[in-house]
Structures are given as C-alpha cells and as structure tokens.
C-alpha cells in the first residue's frame, strides 16, 4: 500500500499486526510512524508500551512482541536497521533468525504491532522480506509528485495561517527542492517573513529561501543568457566556494542549455509553456521563464551552447583541458556565442 492508504487505515482504526515501512521519503515515513504511535499508545503510557530495537535477532524481537501491553490494547515494537531486510546482519546467525521469524510472523500476536522501519528500500532478495510480503502490510513511502507536494505545502501553510498561490508554490518547489524536511524549514521561515500578511509572495522566496544547486545553476544559465557576465561569474564562484564539483556544474549547465533548446523547438512547434513542461519533465515555473528568453535566440545559438558544454566536459575527462578554470572558460564561450550567434 502507499502512504495515503496507510493514513486512511490508521484514521479508521484498522491497524495491521505487522508493517514494513520502506521508501526514500523519510518525512512522510516518520509522520506515519507518529500517527501510528498516537493511535496505539495511550497518553502518558507511551514509553511503557513501545519497544525500540536496533537490528535484533529473532529471540529479542519475539520477546518484545510477546510482552503484554500496559493499560493499552496493543504494544508497538519498532525494529530499526534490521540486517534481515537490508544490509548485512551482525552479532547473530541471520539465516537462523530469519527462519524463526518467518515461522513466528505467520501468526503474530494480537497484542502487538510490529513495524520494520527501513531506510530507503528493503532488499527484496531477503528471506524475511519474502515472508513479510505474505503476512505483513508493506507500506511504500515514495517521493511526492508535484501535485501532492503542492497540496502538502498548502496544508502546512494553512496550519500557520498562511496561503500560497499555485504559481508561487511551483516557484518554491523549484527553488528549494522537494526534500520535505528542508521544505518544512523554509515554510516556517516564509511564514515568519510574511508577518501579518496572509499570502506568501514570490519575492519572499527570492529573499529568504535557501536555493538548491540545481536552481543556482538554472539561475547561472539565465544570467549568461541575459549577458550579465559580472553576475554570472559571481554565481559560479559562489558555487565552487560552496564545494560543488566543476564537472558536476558543467553537467548541470549542459542540461540547462539542452532544456532551453528543447523549449525553443517546442515553442516553434506551437506548444504552450505548461504543455512543454509536461513533455520535457521540467518545472512549469522554469519553463515559463525560458519560453520568453529563448525567443531572443536562434536555434543554432542554443545548439552551439549545449555543444560547447559537452565539448568542455569531454576535454576535461579526456585530460585535454585542465579542470581548474574549465567552468569559467565555458562561460566565456557561452557569452561569445550569445553575442556572435556562432560557435
């Protein structure tokens, strides 16, 4: 099941005897665990009715699950970093423990709710995982898509007494990224910045939000297209100073140039910005800006810019160009292509 189905079940009081929480979206995963705790554990008796075990063997896990709850219907047994689901088990015989648990979990106790909390994905080849697929609820916590993230942001801001327009929300996601832990911190900052004003504005995001590397490279590419050499080199130096690798930045810059070329071609075919965004998998907010900018450039110029980045990356990797200064040389070439309209 996905996280939405899990939250629905918990709200209705439908609690399974055993769960596996897996997937890369840690914020929602932790929220799900908090919701389960709140549903299962009486206030004031949480510590008495929860066992937290790190990579336990079968005996330790079974002992915790068999312990009766105190003034509660169920006891929560949280299993962290189980080597029987991911990684390599230590300090015990994995095969023996997995076999014992597979047998035990065919008929888990009604007085316990066992949660295997896995960072990232469980190893599907493990014997225990194969058994859990039959007897437990596997809950997948995958990254939210843009629509889900927009709803999540609106809900968080509503709790703070704020609101945000859809285009501004798209700008926020593109600027700050899709990590919900980071976004939750940015939302608190935005709410504080807005003060008594109810609506979060685009300029609030520009003023206080921490920008992702991808956004900063996008900003660098746009600055180059505007011909603002001074600002472009200021941005590139800041990226290098913050520890970003030159080859990584070249690859991102190449991606931005290729994306701008795609926008140019699709614009020429009569497509509108939102349709282009869906086709090339780019944020609508960014595509709407590119849509206006690429009108000032020929297809040849944009092709030459993308090729320039590719050539530099190849020359650096093949040892024909020194890594130091490669980004700056590429930027100078892009500025020349902008002015001359040829490579």
Describe the residue ranges of each PLM region.
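Conserved beta/loop motifs at nucleotide-recognition and modification sites
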Residues: 1-343
């Amino acid at each position: 099941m996905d996280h939405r189905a899990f939250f629905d079940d918990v709200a209705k009081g439908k609690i399974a005897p055993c769960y596996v929480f897996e997937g890369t979206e840690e914020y929602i995963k932790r929220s799900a665990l908090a919701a389960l705790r709140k549903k299962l554990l009486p206030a004031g008796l949480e510590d008495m009715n929860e066992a937290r075990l790190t990579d336990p063997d079968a005996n330790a896990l079974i002992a915790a699950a068999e312990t009766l709850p105190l003034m509660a219907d169920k006891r929560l047994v949280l299993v962290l970093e189980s080597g029987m689901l991911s990684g390599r088990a230590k300090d015990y015989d994995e095969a023996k423990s997995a076999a014992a648990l597979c047998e035990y979990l065919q008929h888990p106790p009604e007085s316990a709710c066992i949660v295997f909390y896995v960072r990232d994905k469980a190893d599907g080849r493990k014997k225990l995982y194969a058994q859990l697929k039959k007897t437990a609820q596997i809950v997948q916590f995958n990254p939210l898509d843009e629509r889900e993230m927009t709803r999540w942001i609106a809900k968080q801001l509503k709790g703070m007494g704020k609101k945000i327009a859809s285009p501004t929300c798209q700008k926020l996601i593109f600027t700050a990224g899709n990590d919900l832990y980071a976004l939750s911190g940015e939302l608190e900052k935005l709410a504080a910045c807005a003060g008594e004003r109810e609506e979060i504005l685009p300029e609030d995001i520009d003023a206080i939000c921490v920008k992702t590397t991808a956004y900063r490279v996008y900003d660098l590419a746009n600055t180059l297209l505007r011909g603002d050499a001074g600002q472009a080199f200021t941005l590139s130096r800041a990226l290098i100073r913050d520890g970003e690798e030159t080859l990584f930045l070249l690859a991102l810059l190449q991606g931005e140039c290729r994306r701008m070329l795609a926008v140019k071609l699709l614009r020429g075919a009569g497509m509108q910005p939102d349709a282009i965004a869906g086709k090339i998998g780019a944020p609508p907010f960014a595509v709407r800006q590119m849509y206006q900018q690429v009108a000032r450039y020929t297809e040849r110029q944009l092709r030459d810019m993308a090729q320039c980045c590719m050539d530099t990356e190849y020359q650096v990797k093949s040892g024909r160009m020194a890594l130091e200064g490669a980004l700056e040389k590429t930027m100078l070439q892009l500025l020349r292509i902008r002015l001359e309209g040829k490579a």
